[in-house]
């Protein structure tokens, strides 16, 4: 053994060839600060070996290196810029020394090589991969950019266009694509990986492969003519501006850095990468996006822990076909759980099957499946007008009309047709689960399962625990949702549960602004362009359906009369009374016409201004700051109440539910992350300016207490220990 660290070791293989093996405790390898330091020590040992002829890098895990240790990021981001820059220089010196070894090097890459893992193998001369490879640089999705030389080496290896596509979008690619663009040199079966890598290494040692020529382009300026450079970088900057926008500075910073570094050799180019990385790491956007990653891991880990002792349902059923039922049936079947889809008429069943077939055909068109797979999936969805097969199902989700009487009748009837241990769930969006449970003989086997539309796209499923829902019931439904590829978050019961309960105060803030003379077009523009929502409130209401919102608004008002009962006729009432239901009938705040792809395109409609004039004061202008404050305060206050009342368990789950269920702008990180970034004291000062607008603007007492001590909702993060304490030489 040449070297043994906590996460890697170095040993001789044969005839002057050494192997450097990543083998961290636990299930995966991460390139954390300790591993980088250990890698530097191992390379120091290699540099002393006069008889070294070649080096093989490999992993003892199912994945090569999954990336940097993101749990370290928030504390690293608090380190002063100078110290962070110093540590990055040290880390890059380690990879440079790996790249500069006077012998050929190869990485045998299995599974994932992401972020720092990808940057590590870019420093070797050759890369051989297995078919399950996923390799790339996802850093821009975390609000930063590659910091271990990825923005320098990848463009020089692949060419600017291929590298920009991966780096700016934070993409990873599979084995075939990686081979095609030159990111790996070959792909072999897993059992042949080491043998194949050794064969390449021997060829390089024997002079059959020119490893020095392979290495040289990574040390030099990027080979691009002035015209090629102008075209590549102009197109990349245009694409990034269009897709990422101003709220995500990392992608455009990465592109500009690669452009600026193109004319330099490795050392100067790495210095530019360092200078760009450090300021990005100190942005609120980076902290928010890293926070989302960590919250996502937490939520998924919680679901895994919850379901460790239950069997995932093997057969499911959906009550109520149509678009929603068809979407749920498709998602279940697509992920391998056969489903019976029941309705009371053929027309609805046809609609449900058509929806499932449409979604499968899209997969076929994209080349994700072939005709055989399509036929196989669709054959596991069984449409029926009766209860045939219900005696074999493990879980049933009801997705009929949003009417408590109808839902109770359907659920009570279904309970008589299934096994005593079958779990029933309701896809209601607002009706309390404990109220629906009153119709059942076995309420312990019942809970809520709130999907979001469109089912195949929206990652969140709210799992609602009723007063009598058993732990086993919740666990089974969480297991099914996870199997369907969704992110389940368990919440406690109340009208609207969590997501809709906090959404309708936001809509109420919108209605009050319109009542006071604001223009809905400006509100939408501000909430989209300035705050960052994917849709402004008017557009969102049109997509949700004005009729749906009108009904849900009444349910929420009955559930929370003190805050959500309004004493005036609002814009939603006016549009509903005029039969303007949104996209579903082509008339809402906007008029909708289908574009060439069959998607609804919004157009101005002057009739709306006349309708709104009946329920609004004369038009007046509002500042962007006031619009954002009046829209967000009711939502954030309600989010805080949900935490205080135990409707949602943690700030992390609340923020993920908002991001995954409502499209809360990820660069804000969710309501609690936004609140912490703003500061509770500053938020309280802002909210108090609007408390005269009514109970929705009254800040909960718990938040007032936080503000008095300026406490955050997330646990405070300590800066990483001074970088000088790490090995930096």
UniProtKB/Swiss-Prot annotation:
InterPro entries hit by this protein: 3-OHacyl-CoA_DH_CS, 3-OHacyl-CoA_DH_NAD-bd, 3HC_DH_C, 6-PGluconate_DH-like_C_sf, ClpP/crotonase-like_dom_sf, Enoyl-CoA_hyd/isom_CS, Enoyl-CoA_hydra/iso, FA_oxidation_alpha_subunit
GO MF term (any one): long-chain-3-hydroxyacyl-CoA dehydrogenase activity
GO biological process entries: fatty acid beta-oxidation
The protein's Enzyme Commission number: 4.2.1.17, 5.1.2.3, 5.3.3.8, 1.1.1.35
Catalytic activity: a (3S)-3-hydroxyacyl-CoA + NAD(+) = a 3-oxoacyl-CoA + NADH + H(+); a (3S)-3-hydroxyacyl-CoA = a (2E)-enoyl-CoA + H2O; a 4-saturated-(3S)-3-hydroxyacyl-CoA = a (3E)-enoyl-CoA + H2O; (3S)-3-hydroxybutanoyl-CoA = (3R)-3-hydroxybutanoyl-CoA
PROSITE patterns: 3HCDH, ENOYL_COA_HYDRATASE
UniProt-annotated binding residues for substrate: 296, 500, 660
Region Disordered, residue ranges: 708-729
GO CC terms: fatty acid beta-oxidation multienzyme complex
Annotated metabolic or biological route of this protein: Lipid metabolism; fatty acid beta-oxidation
Residue(s) at site: Important for catalytic activity: 119, 139
Positions bound to NAD(+): 324, 343, 400-402, 407, 429, 453
Annotated segments matching region Enoyl-CoA hydratase/isomerase: 1-189
Record keywords: Fatty acid metabolism, Isomerase, Lipid degradation, Lipid metabolism, Lyase, Multifunctional enzyme, NAD, Oxidoreductase
List of catalytic residues: 450 (for 3-hydroxyacyl-coa dehydrogenase activity)
Gene3D superfamilies found in the cross-reference section: 1.10.1040.50, 2-enoyl-CoA Hydratase, Chain A, domain 1 (3.90.226.10), NAD(P)-binding Rossmann-like Domain (3.40.50.720)
Cystine pairings recorded for this chain: none
Pfam family, one: 3HCDH_N
Function: Involved in the aerobic and anaerobic degradation of long-chain fatty acids via beta-oxidation cycle. Catalyzes the formation of 3-oxoacyl-CoA from enoyl-CoA via L-3-hydroxyacyl-CoA. It can also use D-3-hydroxyacyl-CoA and cis-3-enoyl-CoA as substrate.
Assembly and oligomerization: Heterotetramer of two alpha chains (FadB) and two beta chains (FadA).
Full protein name: Fatty acid oxidation complex subunit alpha
Source organism: Escherichia coli (strain SMS-3-5 / SECEC)
């Amino acid at each position: 053994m040449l070297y043994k660290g906590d996460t890697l070791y170095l040993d001789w293989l044969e005839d002057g060839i050494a192997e450097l093996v990543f083998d961290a405790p636990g299930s995966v390898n991460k390139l954390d600060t300790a591993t980088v330091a250990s890698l530097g020590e191992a390379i120091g040992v290699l540099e002393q070996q006069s008889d070294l002829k070649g080096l093989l890098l490999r992993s003892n895990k199912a994945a090569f290196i999954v990336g940097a240790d993101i749990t370290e990021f928030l504390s690293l981001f608090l380190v002063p810029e100078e110290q962070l820059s110093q540590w990055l220089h040290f880390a890059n010196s380690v990879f440079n020394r790996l790249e500069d070894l006077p012998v050929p090097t190869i990485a045998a890459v299995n599974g994932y090589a992401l972020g720092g893992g990808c940057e590590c193998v870019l420093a070797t001369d050759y890369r051989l991969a297995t078919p399950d490879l996923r390799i790339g640089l996802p850093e821009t999705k975390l609000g930063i950019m590659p910091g271990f030389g990825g923005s320098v080496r990848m463009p020089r290896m692949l060419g600017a266009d291929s590298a920009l596509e991966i780096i700016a979008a934070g993409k990873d690619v599979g084995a075939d694509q990686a081979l095609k663009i030159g990111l790996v040199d070959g792909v072999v079966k897993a059992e042949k990986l080491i043998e194949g890598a050794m064969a390449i290494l021997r060829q390089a040692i024997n002079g059959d492969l020119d490893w020095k020529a392979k290495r040289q382009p990574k040390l030099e300026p990027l080979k691009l003519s002035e015209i090629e450079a102008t075209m590549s970088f102009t197109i990349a900057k245009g694409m990034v501006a269009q897709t990422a926008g101003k709220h995500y500075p990392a992608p455009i910073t990465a592109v500009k850095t690669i452009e600026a570094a193109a004319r330099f050799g490795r050392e100067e180019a790495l210095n530019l990468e360092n200078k760009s990385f450090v300021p990005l790491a100190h942005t609120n956007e980076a902290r928010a996006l890293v926070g989302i990653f960590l919250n996502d891991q937490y939520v998924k880990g919680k679901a895994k822990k919850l379901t460790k002792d239950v069997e995932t349902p093997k057969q499911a059923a959906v009550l109520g076909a149509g678009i929603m039922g068809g979407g749920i049936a498709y998602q279940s079947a697509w992920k391998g759980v056969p489903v019976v889809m029941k309705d009371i008429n053929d027309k609805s069943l046809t609609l449900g099957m058509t929806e499932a077939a449409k979604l499968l055909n899209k997969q076929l068109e994209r080349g994700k499946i072939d005709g055989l797979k399509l036929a196989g999936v669709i054959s596991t969805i069984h449409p029926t007008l009766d209860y045939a097969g219900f005696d074999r199902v493990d879980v049933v989700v009801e997705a009929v009309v949003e009417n408590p009487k109808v839902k109770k009748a359907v659920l009570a009837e279904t309970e008589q047709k299934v096994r005593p241990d079958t779990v029933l769930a309701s896809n209601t969006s607002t009706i309390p689960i404990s109220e629906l449970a009153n119709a059942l003989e076995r309420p312990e086997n019942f809970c809520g399962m709130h999907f979001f539309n469109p089912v195949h796209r929206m990652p969140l499923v709210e799992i609602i625990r009723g007063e009598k829902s058993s732990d086993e019931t919740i666990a089974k439904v969480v297991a099914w949702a996870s199997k369907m590829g969704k992110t389940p978050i368990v919440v406690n019961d109340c009208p609207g549960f969590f997501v809709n309960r906090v959404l309708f105060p936001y809509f109420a803030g919108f209605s009050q602004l319109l009542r006071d003379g604001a223009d809905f077009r400006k509100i939408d523009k501000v909430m989209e362009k300035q705050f960052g929502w994917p849709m402004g409130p008017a557009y969102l209401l049109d997509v949700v359906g004005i009729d749906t919102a009108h009904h849900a608004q009444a349910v929420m008002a009955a559930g929370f009369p003190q805050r959500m009962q309004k004493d005036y006729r609002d814009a939603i009432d006016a549009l509903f009374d005029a039969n303007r239901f949104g996209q579903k009938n082509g008339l809402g705040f906007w008029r909708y016409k289908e574009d060439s792809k069959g998607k609804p395109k919004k157009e101005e409609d002057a009739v709306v201004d006349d309708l709104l004039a009946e329920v609004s004061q004369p038009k007046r202008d509002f500042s962007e700051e006031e619009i954002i404050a009046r829209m967000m305060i009711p939502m954030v206050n309600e989010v805080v109440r949900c935490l205080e009342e135990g409707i949602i368990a943690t700030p992390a789950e609340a923020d993920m539910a908002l991001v995954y269920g409502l499209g809360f702008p990820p660069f804000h990180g969710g309501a609690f992350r936004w609140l912490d970034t703003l500061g509770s004291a500053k938020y309280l000062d802002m909210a108090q300016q609007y408390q005269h607008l009514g109970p929705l603007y009254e800040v909960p007492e718990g938040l007032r207490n936080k503000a008095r001590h300026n406490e955050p909702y997330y646990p405070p993060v300590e800066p990483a220990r001074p970088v000088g304490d790490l090995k930096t030489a």
